[in-house]
Amino acid sequence: MSNKTICIDIDGTLVHYEEWKGEEHFGGIIEGASSATHKLHENGWYIIIYSTRANKELISRFLDDSKIEFDSINENPNQPENAKDGKPYADIYVDDRAICFNGDWEQTLMEIEKFKPWEMEGIENKNEQLSN
């Protein structure tokens, strides 16, 4: 068993994401995602795929077909029984729609106001270039 646990989101983190197109649609794999999950496993990480997607069978099949390594989906079986409802425990969470809290709520509120997922910034930049 691993000492380190990581939760990784799917959309916008492992695969490209612009908008929801249904549970059976997954964007293309982001370059480096597969090799990163392999390296994490080699380095002893327990990988939880953590997503708002609910169909674990579809997720598992897609990840297997895409050669994305993982240990579980939306749950950490290593958590105590009384802590299994809700967010899985992990040492690190990787998500395209997260802000790292640094203890300063004033700074965090400013970051929330200006926040855009990384792929949305690219789309806005392309649209801006097209309109010029």
Q: What do the PLM-derived regions correspond to, one by one?
A:
Residues 1-132:
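HAD-like aspartate-dependent phosphatase fold
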